[in-house]
């Protein structure tokens, strides 16, 4: 039991701390294991805790303000590169994209106030909004052109009254969705977690609401946020096959529907967590993926033979390469977040 718990912890822990205790056997080297179903439950539980920890969540979000299918479909069309699979691989600074749907307040026929809340779950700390755009749906009488003023309101000192930071003027001549790129004042407000906009019709008296906010036309802000960090590309190691007992990568798939997370995780449907298992003879210690040259293997074998009294037990089968998980999900404010969670997928295993 203890051996299997240590194994599962090792699978999800950073590779830099995989150092076996002196005189002890590595927990991934074929010691006593749990029953297959118990091991599966343990790995699923650890996968859930790992995702929540890396999203800075104490528990899975509860959707108090569900988004309609029509609004979700419209919003996703404006995301750049919605993930089709679970893996991404690049060397860019890590970024995420957030879609925040508006809460409407203090509105009249000719003026609409929109409030947007940006959670700090995933983007806590050094987040910086790089781009932000307002998407809103306008319904106008035919053959008319109206001027729309968009005001960016920010909180004053000590979070007191809202004050005008900047404003934009738009000529709107057709019904439908319209996009307004937002400048640094609005981006700074998004970075701080809250943005308030006022949309005002200039020189016109509307007979009915021009800015629609129903289920299918709910305004939203799409923001691109820089989080920091880089992904590294590593070569693949050896996959477990048949009855092999050597260090290898064992495939393990986490199905979000199976664990009851499909309501708040939009994409993907699951991901390949994988883990490392198998024995590590001393002569292949320190060889990532057991893929070093024959000459290196010979040198390590000679080193092992000259180590008096040394037995196989000081080297562990550990992850040597990981990849991020690309996730599209609802946060606790019902915003849609697209982000890459680093080090979630074990790509290769080797002996420490």
Curated annotation (Swiss-Prot):
Cell location: Secreted
Residues cleaved off as propeptide: 19-236
Subunit description: Homodimeric or heterodimeric through association with alpha and beta subunits, linked by one or more disulfide bonds. Inhibins are heterodimers of one alpha and one beta subunit. Activins are homo- or heterodimers of beta subunits only.
Keyword Cytoplasm found: no
PANTHER family on file: INHIBIN BETA C CHAIN, TGF-BETA FAMILY
Top-rank taxon, per record: Eukaryota
Example of a GO cellular component annotation carried by this entry: extracellular space
Family indicated by similarity: Belongs to the TGF-beta family.
Keyword check for DNA repair: no
Disulphides: 240-248, 247-317, 276-349, 280-351
Pfam families (alphabetical): TGF_beta
Protein name as catalogued: Inhibin beta C chain
Ranges in coiled-coil conformation: none
Keywords carried by this UniProt record: Cleavage on pair of basic residues, Disulfide bond, Glycoprotein, Growth factor, Hormone, Secreted, Signal
Gene3D superfamilies: 2.60.120.970, Cystine-knot cytokines
Tissue specificity note: Expressed in benign prostatic hyperplasia.
InterPro entries: Cystine-knot_cytokine, Inhibin_betaC, TGF-b_C, TGF-beta-rel, TGFb_CS
């Amino acid at each position: 039991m203890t051996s299997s718990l240590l194994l599962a912890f090792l699978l999800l822990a950073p590779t830099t701390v995989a150092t076996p205790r002196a005189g002890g056997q590595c927990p991934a080297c074929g010691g006593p294991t749990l029953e297959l179903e118990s091991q599966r439950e343990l790995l699923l539980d650890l996968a859930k805790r790992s995702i929540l920890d890396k999203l800075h969540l104490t528990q899975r979000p509860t959707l108090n303000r569900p988004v309609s299918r029509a609004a979700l479909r419209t919003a996703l069309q404006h995301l750049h590169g919605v993930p089709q699979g679970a893996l991404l691989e690049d060397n860019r600074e890590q970024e995420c994209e957030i879609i925040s749907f508006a809460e409407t307040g203090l509105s009249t026929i000719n003026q609409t106030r929109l409030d947007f809340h940006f959670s700090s779950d995933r983007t806590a700390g050094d987040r910086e909004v790089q781009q932000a755009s307002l998407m809103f749906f306008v319904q106008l009488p035919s053959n008319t052109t109206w001027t729309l003023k968009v005001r960016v309101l920010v909180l004053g000192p000590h979070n007191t009254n809202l004050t005008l930071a900047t404003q934009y003027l738009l000529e709107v001549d057709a019904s439908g969705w319209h996009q307004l790129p937002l400048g640094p004042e609005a981006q700074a407000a998004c970075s701080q977690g809250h943005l308030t906009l006022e949309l005002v019709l200039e020189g016109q008296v509307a007979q009915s609401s021009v800015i629609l906010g129903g289920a299918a036309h709910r305004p939203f802000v799409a923001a691109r946020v820089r989080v920091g960090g880089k992904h590294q590309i590593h070569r693949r190691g050896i996959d477990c096959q048949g009855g092999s007992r050597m260090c290898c990568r064992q495939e393990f798939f986490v199905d979000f529907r199976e664990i009851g997370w499909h309501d708040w995780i939009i994409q993907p449907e699951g991901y390949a967590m994988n883990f490392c298992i198998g024995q590590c003879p001393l002569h292949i210690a320190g060889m990532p993926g057991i893929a070093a040259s024959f000459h290196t293997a010979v040198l390590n074998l000679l080193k092992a033979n000259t180590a008096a009294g040394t037995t196989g037990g000081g080297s562990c089968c550990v992850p040597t390469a990981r990849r991020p998980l690309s996730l599209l999900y609802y946060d606790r404010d019902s915003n849609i977040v697209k982000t890459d969670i680093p080090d979630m997928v074990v790509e290769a295993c080797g002996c420490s």
